Amino acid sequence: MTLLKNDTFLRALLKQPVEYTPIWMMRQAGRYLPEYKATRAKAGSFLDLCKNTELATEVTIQPLERFDLDAAILFSDILTVPDAMGLGLYFAEGEGPKFKRALQHEDDIAKLHVPDMEKLQYVFDAVTSIRKALDGRVPLIGFSGSPFTLACYMVEGGSSKEFRTIKTMMYSRPDLLHKILDTNAQAVTAYLNAQIDAGAQAVQIFDTWGGVLSDAAFKEFSLKYIRQIVAGLKRESEGRRVPVIVFAKGGGLWLESMAQIGADALGLDWTCNIGEARRRVGKQVALQGNFDPFALFGTPESIRTEVARILADYGHGSGHVFNLGHGINQHADPEHAKILVDTVHELSRQYHGG
């Protein structure tokens, strides 16, 4: 594989010295970019875009052509794994993802098993293709949803505001939910390891819905299974460490517990103070985040002010990857995203070196 020209992102995750704070943005390849919309129209549907190696490569690279980002992230969807389990993923216009066969009956849950990774070969082909297209420019991040977040969609049959169905199962038949979560954890471990084998240089586990759980439930039904995945991941590839980032939206309460599961970095949503988070867990893990995605709707001046505040809160030294606290909004102005990226690079140098 080609030598990396810019490994600042990987070094920051391992708290090695860097010259500036690296930045990438969750959902950086997405609907806020006109070029993404054009490619998606060419693909036909979102799922067709994910499954077309050439087009998935194209949209992964698009934000790097526009912004000076320090990492690329595989263009895919967290729901590829349950789709490979036979749940029948589809996207309803204006309603987001849905499953034809939600897991709400004991018989269906008993039949659930780890999918053959060959069913996800299109994802691994995309990873290899993107690495080739990047040609060592920046590292490539692979990713998956967490077992609990995947289970939310699998049990509810789509997205939910209340999570009533999965929470009912959690409190009335925890054995059934544990069966789903254990299967998901095994599947995600195999899936991320296959992404690493295909060329992913770091991986992120997205626990988007962990924050809806009580303290005890988060530890039993989410964190336990993320720990299981982290323990099973390949941590070396191509002669260097493959860092693992865990991002639990709404997980600021549990940073200490999350810092103990063996991940290299924790992602923070915008509700946390990153300086406080560093004082709490900065000796154990690097931190990623945590600019409010809606702060991009401010003025160029307010964006600079917010970047300066986050950088100052984190303070001197490595161990910070700048990111949004959640995915970039589809209505964000790409010019404002450029201001964000350039400002992070400009203002962060004072916190590194001598």
Curated annotation (Swiss-Prot):
Its EC number is 4.1.1.37. It is found in: Cytoplasm. The record marks 77 as: Transition state stabilizer. Its main location: cytoplasm. Gene3D superfamilies: 3.20.20.210. Belongs to the uroporphyrinogen decarboxylase family. This is Uroporphyrinogen decarboxylase. It comes from Neisseria meningitidis serogroup A / serotype 4A (strain DSM 15465 / Z2491). The lineage of its organism: Bacteria, Pseudomonadati, Pseudomonadota, Betaproteobacteria, Neisseriales.
